[in-house]
Amino acid sequence: MILYKNVDICDLEPIAKNGILSIDECGNNNWDKGKRAENDTSVVYLFSPIGKQNSFPNYGAALLEVQCEAKENKIGKTDTHVDDYIEYITKRVKPSEIKRVIIPKIFKGYISVPKNIEITWCEFKAERYGNNGLEECSDEIIEQFVKTAQLMDSTDFNFFRGVTEKRTMIDLYNIEYIF
């Protein structure tokens, strides 16, 4: 089955070498204390998007497409993404089961990708709050976002948040990686 997982760009090299490992197996627990749901740390979480939003970069700006066996995991009713995707779990994802690493091509000049990692560069769409609620981001807003946002590591302060020229935050919603 084809499933997806967002990961940090800075973690691509060890993922390419070792696959996607559980927190228990790899020791990479980059969740802020008290901000992680009571999820099992001995499994790998994957997703299948329900709507048009197909990437959840709060977990990392690189989207991995994987083909592996996994079982559906019931998401709690209060989970942030309960209406966004179906969650799956597996013990681990082998490197050979990672089919693509997908990153928006507009990020190219602002990130560092290991030379041995093949990237599928994609288009990028998102929405942000404007005067009339959520509205599609203009090309100018997307460019300003990419120039000013931290994109490599989700533990960085203000990760995946841009700043306008007037110094207000650019927060994106309903993010689509178009590939």
Regions found by a protein language model. Give the residues of each.
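ADP-ribose/NAD+-binding catalytic cleft of ART/PARP-like enzymes
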Residues: 1-42
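Intrinsically disordered, low-complexity, compositionally biased regions/tails
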Residues: 23, 31, 38, 80, ...
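C-terminal, well-folded lobe of enzymatic/effector domains
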Residues: 100-179
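General structural signal for secondary-structure boundaries
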Residues: 7-11, 93-95, 150, 156, ...
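ADP-ribosyltransferase catalytic core
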Residues: 26-99, 103
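Surface-exposed flexible segments
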Residues: 11-28, 72-89, 110-122
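Short beta-strand element of the conserved SAM-dependent methyltransferase core
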Residues: 4-7, 62-68, 118, 151, ...
